[in-house]
Amino acid sequence: ASHPEFDTLFGAVSISNEHSDMARALISECMLESFQAEQKFLNNVEPVAPLSVSAKVWSREMLATLCHVPLVNKLVGCCDPGKALPILLRHYLSLNGKFVCFSVNKAFNDSLDGLILVDLSKVPEKYMKRYLGAEGLENYQKHWKNQVQADNDSA
């Protein structure tokens, strides 16, 4: 809220190694198929330690039809009974987060970390208000309205 000039947030979301490699591969590939960041971000980042899984039971074509959050959640439960998509991952998706890549994090108990970007201009207003507060949201909106106006004036 104190820096309305920033419009993109990034960070990691972890998928615990308590999920099987098959479930983690399914999650990561579905996220990259349906919720992938823009190409300009993909060109500059690559995973340090990609998750390697053999004998996948899906094709890329299947992923395009499978990748709806409730369905992926059910499939994860089929791979790993009692497990589901991590809550934080689902939350970032509700903010319209986009994934850049996934990498196994050896320093964090072999979790599978996804690099995610959140474009604040695409976050639903109810979440912006929750996280920034009414005044912070107003400042953010005012800043970007002025920025767009300045860009239009200079064009």
Report each predicted region and the residues it spans.
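Short, intrinsically disordered/low-complexity patches at protein termini
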Residues: 33-34, 123-125, 149-151
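Short, highly charged low-complexity linear segments
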Residues: 53-58, 131-132, 151
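C-terminal "cap" of GNAT-fold acetyltransferases
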Residues: 110-124
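Short, basic, helix/turn surface patches
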Residues: 36-44, 124-138
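Short, cationic low-complexity segments
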Residues: 135-155
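Composition- and surface-driven signal marking solvent-exposed, interaction-prone regions
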Residues: 103-105, 115, 128-132
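Acyl-donor binding region in acyl/amide transferases
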Residues: 1-113
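Short, low-complexity, polar/charged sequence segments that are solvent-exposed and flexible
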Residues: 28-32, 118-122, 133-139
